Structure formats: structure tokens, C-alpha cells
Amino acid sequence: MQTIALAVIGGTGVYTLSQFDDVQVYEVETLYGRPSGPIRVGMLFGQRVAFFARHGEEHALPPHKINYRANIAALQQLGVSRVLALNTVGGINEAFGPRTLVCPDQLIDYTWGRVSTFCEEVGSEVLHVDFGHPYSPLLRGCLLRAARDVDVSLVEYGCYGVTQGPRLETIAEIDRLRRDGCDLVGMTGMPEAALAREKGLEYACLGIVSNWAAGCGDGAEITMGEILSNVATAFSCLPELISKVARE
């Protein structure tokens, strides 16, 4: 197989890549089971890119039921070394309103009960990986440069609070996240980032703010219609940005 320049993991509302040509579909089996769906490899503005939808192509997998280990292992089996994760998130900080694109540099994990490491098999090596900077500085740098080159507005920092889901958070829970220093809230950032680190992959997050978190902004009720509409609007500029990252 030809070298894959970049793998993209699609989040809520992102189930395919537009302008994706010469696509081949791979059904990958791993030691940890099957990934969320088939992995599609094709050309995006001249760059060879892999893509799959984290929640499945029909959005059938809630955040706590995603086989994160199989997803990361499948990408590694295809020879992927760089992963750009698209995460649909809610805005807590007033600078992170709906339709904002964000490249977070930190996260806090509030999830529980998810299989969060590859170090579980008998005889496997125990890895105490450095996770002080949970996102690859190298790939984050590529993303930030690419955004400037294609004139895409991107917030260049942020702390992503990862909650269990699938329900949205209470106002009190969001107040707690704010006090903890979180700018964004979502449900799929972990254990994905940590598993990628264990496998030695360069991994970065591109957050798509779909709505204000509970009690933030105008305080209106959050609906799936609002979330999907805002993701679609924000995503319109991303194929060119993704191809630019792949080219870096």
C-alpha cells in the first residue's frame, strides 16, 4: 500500500469527506476486534488520506461503546503514523462559540469504565507513556500552519474536558469543568488520545464547536438539529485544510 499521509477520524456530523477521490475501502480486523467501520483511503486534493467515522457511518455507536483500541490499532496496521481527530464539542469559554474551530493543547479526562490502554494482555509490555502534552506538538504545528496558509480561522489553544456521555452535561457539571480550567466539553477525546500515544502515533485534535455547553452563551436548550447544522457549516472549509495538513 502507498504511504498514507494522514488519517482523519470523523466525529458527530462528519461521516464522510467531500472531494475524496479514488477511494479504496478496507475492512480491518485487529487483535481488539473490529473498528467503528470501514476505513476509506483515497486522494484529497492530491494527498493520500485515510478516513473513518468514529461513531460508525450510521452514528450507531455512543461514545462509551466505541472500540477505541480497535480504531487506533486498525490505523496502525494500515501504516498510519499521523492522526487528525475531528471532535464535535460544546463551548464553555466565551471565546469558543458555535461554529468555532479549535486546536486544543490540553485535556482533562472525566470518563470512566472505558478500556483505556493496550497494556492489558498477559505478557504485554507495560508502558508509562509521557502524556503531559496529550496532543502531538509536531502535528499541532502542522495544523496551525496549514490554517494560516489557507486562511481558516482557528483558535490555537484550549483545554478539552472529556465526559462520559451519551447524555449532555448539567449546568452544575459545566460549572465544575469551567473551574477546572476546561474551555470545551465533549465525549470522545479519551481514551483515543492516550491510545494513540501508546502506539507512538502523532495525534492532534481539531475541535468543531457545535453549541454552547449547558448554561453557557444564551443558555438555550441544546438540540441535535442545532449541533448538526453548526457542524455542517463549520466543516465546509475543512477538506482543503485537511489536505494542507497532509501535505506538511
Curated annotation (Swiss-Prot):
Example GO biological process: L-methionine salvage from methylthioadenosine
Alphabetically ordered keywords of this record: Glycosyltransferase, Purine salvage, Transferase
Residues given in the record as substrate binding sites: M187, N211, W212, A213
Record Pfam families: PNP_UDP_1
Enzyme class name: transferase
A cellular component term, taken from the record's GO annotations: cytosol
The protein's role, per its UniProt record: Catalyzes the reversible phosphorylation of S-methyl-5'-thioinosine (MTI) to hypoxanthine and 5-methylthioribose-1-phosphate. Involved in the breakdown of S-methyl-5'-thioadenosine (MTA), a major by-product of polyamine biosynthesis. Catabolism of (MTA) occurs via deamination to MTI and phosphorolysis to hypoxanthine.
Name of the protein this chain belongs to: Probable S-methyl-5'-thioinosine phosphorylase
Organism: Xylella fastidiosa (strain Temecula1 / ATCC 700964)
